[in-house]
């Protein structure tokens, strides 16, 4: 995953 929040 590139971005994970």
UniProtKB/Swiss-Prot annotation:
Q: Which UniProt keywords apply?
A: Cell wall, Secreted
Q: Where in the cell is it found?
A: Secreted, Cell wall
* GO cellular component terms listed in the entry, alphabetical order: extracellular region
Identify the domain of life.
Eukaryota
The identity of this protein, by name, is: 42 kDa cell wall protein
Species per Swiss-Prot/TrEMBL record: Solanum lycopersicum (Tomato)
């Amino acid at each position: 995953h590139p971005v994970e929040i």
